[in-house]
Amino acid sequence: VLKQYNPNVRLIYNGFDPELFYPQQIKTSRFIITYTGRLLSLAIRNPELLFAAIARLTEDKVIIPETFRVVWYTDQESRSIIRQEAERHGVQSFMDYHEYVPASDIPLILNKSSVLLSLTNKFDTSGPKGFMTTKFFESLAVEKPILCVQSDEAYLAEAIKETHSGLAATRVDEVYDFLKHYYEEWQEKGYTTSPVNRDKLSNYSRKEQASQFAHIFEEI
């Protein structure tokens, strides 16, 4: 938008520190979907597609609570919203809740996860699209499958598609197939990996961002 007023505007994305966030293959005894952050409004972040897909997977006897968990690291107010929605879809037995953890614990938590959850929603044309938080880029860095529900159909979806890092979903059947695929991979190997395009991924590293800043200053 700013380029309409000044053609010299440059966009440098937020990103991840590759010395802290990098992929590790850690076997786990359970399939774990992890979310870290707040959920203060379903209008901004909505897990409905995830919960509906889990309900279907349960009905089809694909998953059971003993081996399939959704782990939330969030605050009390957010947990209240999540519990209400999970109960409405009949999937509360799959939920685990934790308080926030120190930032130093996050890399290991992400690498022990089977799927990393990014919650968003589609906004109308007059509103903002796609909150691309640091958490999203850190999820990219560990090369675990990212599930974005509901797709913002904008910048988050584009980044996920460009990096081949997961799914920005708009339908329940997409989430169903995505989770079933990675649940079966976890059953076979004990962990999951995402076929990330590392050339595209490197564009979001702090090292690359520093290079972009340096290039801009050289042009001034």
Predicted segment positions?
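Carbohydrate-associated surface elements
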Residues: 15, 27
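Nucleotide-activated donor-binding/catalytic signature segment of Leloir-type glycosyltransferases, i.e.
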Residues: 67-74, 79-107
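A charged, aromatic-enriched C-terminal amphipathic alpha-helix characteristic of glycosyltransferases
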Residues: 170-174, 187-219
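A conserved mid-protein helix/loop that constitutes part of the nucleotide-sugar donor-binding site
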Residues: 41-59
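A short, active-site helix/loop in glycosyltransferases that binds the activated sugar's phosphate group
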Residues: 1-8
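Acidic donor-binding loop of glycosyltransferase active sites
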Residues: 110-129
